[in-house]
């Protein structure tokens, strides 16, 4: 997944003509000032915002005027990674609310040109009046859109348009020598009921007036950077997991296994959503079917569960529950994860724990000469850990191009080296490259997988997202998402996502099957997860946790063996185990019969002996 707002640029094009009112005289200072003032106004609880763009053309030099000819063209952007259908639906919503007025509130004629999906809409407004030093020219364009709002429960992320890199703020006409100043003011307006501010980018100034909060962003800071405000410090998600387990046994009929299910049983091991300290992620279970035979925590902290299901028919594992995540308010946040490189390497050098997060793999080619060279260049002359992370982040964004076609088709992993050489890349390659660079620099890191860019409605075919985690002493695992192509780097607490599992190697899945049947290839086909934000109140105290499904009342670590679970799995999912299960009852019956016969034989012998003894006494 990439930054869906990266290309949301409000381009401004002016087509008009300039005429001198008398003889041309070189002006002192600016001759013309053109202001483009954009406000994105959001009301708490809505899932849309109102965008108001006020275009003002002022003639400061009375020697000149603009005639009532030419036109002004506004650009209303699309979100480029939306589907064509989504773009068309959103365009209809925008156009139905579109108004174009003059300064007095009167409607102005305009025309619409819809471009191909992803290229936006052009609104052309003919110049309706002459512009002089005594009479400025105003256009007020307004429309509603969902594009700038990401709402999940009480969490709201408002993202505004950036300015193109080629934006100019002043221009001198070569023929007339006149100077034009261009101002691009941008403000986000929210009401007093908005949740607590958690994050903001870039720098802003804030004003409060009449129950509203105004966040203003400097125009130079907006070049290539989308302003972003995150309101809300907690989010609750609901998740549904459904895994259709395939039939693998075509030999034993159901009528026999229904009497003795161990005759045809597969044991599935799957990962469940985990807990995570950085965002205080907690998991609450509403239902699990069937009840897991065992739940444990692996060395990375992932939660794994064992389920027994019939092997001779299709069946299902179904789990529903909730996941809560939290982040600090903007006042409470601090970059406690940052430290000098000297201190950082000094603290981790004697740790045995981080060794497995520094080695190379098939897809993290840290010993490749090209990757080593790039990693060395990026870390050279850097002073702090954050400096290195930011350098790596920018490098990955500059080198890789997100491939939307790969994201929506079969996703073949290519590894860091091939991605750097121009191979098709999605979030997996962005993470692989950054992990390779970090490990080559001696910075322990691992892959994180979960679900990101979440909404209140789960999309069809929801796919997993991959990002990076970096080990930092006294902080723990620090999350970084290099797929988010922006100078506003995704780092630290992120509540627009949930973490499912992590890996210190090339693995991307914890799904395993233990079976006595020959299974050539186990795929994730039939494994479906939906995660979406919750707006209703949920009493989490009435729900269960993983420990409620264990015999001991605690989730054990993988280093603590569960002998009964191991023996049960071995007996039910191996040929030898099944042989034991089938022959053991027969063996026990035979042993029992032999014991009974032996016991009866002994009794008969004793009875005969007693009779013989009595007969001898009578004599």
Model region roles, listed by residue range:
Residues 296-421:
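Acidic low-complexity segments
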Residues 590-606:
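Alpha-helical transmembrane segments
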Residues 380-467, 471-473, 488-499, 503-506, ...:
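Active-site neighborhood of thiol-dependent amide/isopeptide-bond enzymes
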Residues 606-619:
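Cytoplasmic C-terminal tails of single-pass
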Residues 1-9:
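Bacterial N-terminal signal peptides that target proteins for export
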Residues 11-20:
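Bacterial N-terminal signal peptides
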